[in-house]
Amino acid sequence: MAKKWVYLFSEGNAQMRELLGGKGANLAEMTNLGLPVPQGFTITTEACTQYYEDGRTINDEIMGQIMEYIGKMEEITGKKFGDKENPLLVSVRSGARASMPGMMDTILNLGLNEEVVEVLSEKSGNPRWAWDCYRRFIQMYSDVVMEVGKKYFEELIDQMKAKKGVTQDVELTADDLKELAGQFKAEYKEKIGSDFPTDPKEQLMGAIKAVFRSWDNPRANVYRRDNDIPYSWGTAVNVQMMAFGNMGDDCGTGVAFTRDPATGEKGLFGEFLTNAQGEDVVAGVRTPMHISEMEEKFPEAFAQFKEVCKILESHYRDMQDMEFTVEHGKLYMLQT
C-alpha cells in the first residue's frame, strides 16, 4: 500500500497536528464539527521531509496524490481546476505544528489566468472582482513563490491611483485593475526572465514547493533554533477552495478572538472589512471596522458566526483566534 501523503479535511482531526500541522488539523476538526469550512486537503509534514530527502523536488508519488486530491476537490465542489467555464480556484497556505514567523504567506486565487478571468468577469457580471482577484494572485505569487519584492507592485498600484486621482485601492475600476495585471506580468517577466505561469498545475506545484522551501529559510531557521523546534518536523501545506470576500459590499473578511486577548474577558474581539480579501485586514490597506459593526451589515452571517464561536470555545475549551470570510452574506470559516 502506497504511503498516504495527502488528507481531505474530512479525513483528519485535531489530534493529527504532527502530520497535518496546526492549521490543517483544526480545519479538519471544524469540518468534523459540521462548521462552514470551504473544503480542501492537507499535504502532510512527511511530504515536506521527503521533499528535502529527494533533493528539493516533489517526487512522482506525492505529485500523483496531490493531483488525485485536486480531482476529489473537483467532485466535492462541482468545479474544475483550470477550466475556463467553471474554474476551481484555491488558496495555498503553510501550516507547521507550531505557528512560526518566516513561514510562507498565503497565496489566494490560484488557478487564474487571462482566459479564465475573461470568462469569470463575464459570467459573474462583476469584472472588477475578477480582475482584482487576478492582480492579487500575480502579486502574491510573484512575492511568495518567486521572491519578487512586494514593493515593485505596490509602486505600480500607487502610480495607478495617482493617475486616476483616487486614494483607495477599492476605487480602482475593472479596467484599471486589468491594466495593472498586465503591468504586474511585465514586471514579473523583467525580474524573472520568463512569462508568468498560465497553467494552474504549474502554479499549484510552484506554490507547494514555496511552502516547503520556506521551512528552510533564514528567518524560520533562526526561530527554530531559539525555540528548540526540530528541523525534522517539516511543514504541512493546506490547499483550500476559495471563498471570496471581495465580490462586493455584501462580502467581507475578518479576524476575531472569542475573548479579549489582553484580559481573557468573554466577548467577540476583532476586525472586519467589507469587500476585501484576507491580507487587507492585517495589511492596513484600509481601516477595518470593529467586529460588532458586522452585525448591522450582515445580521445572518454574524448570528451564525456567534454560534460557531460558541461551538469552538466549548469544543476546544480555550480562547479561539479565527479567520473568516463572508461571500454574498454567507459565512465561511478559514482558520481557528
Give the label of every model feature segment:
Residues 1-336:
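Nucleotide/phosphate-binding sheet-loop regions of phosphoryl- and nucleotidyl-transfer enzymes
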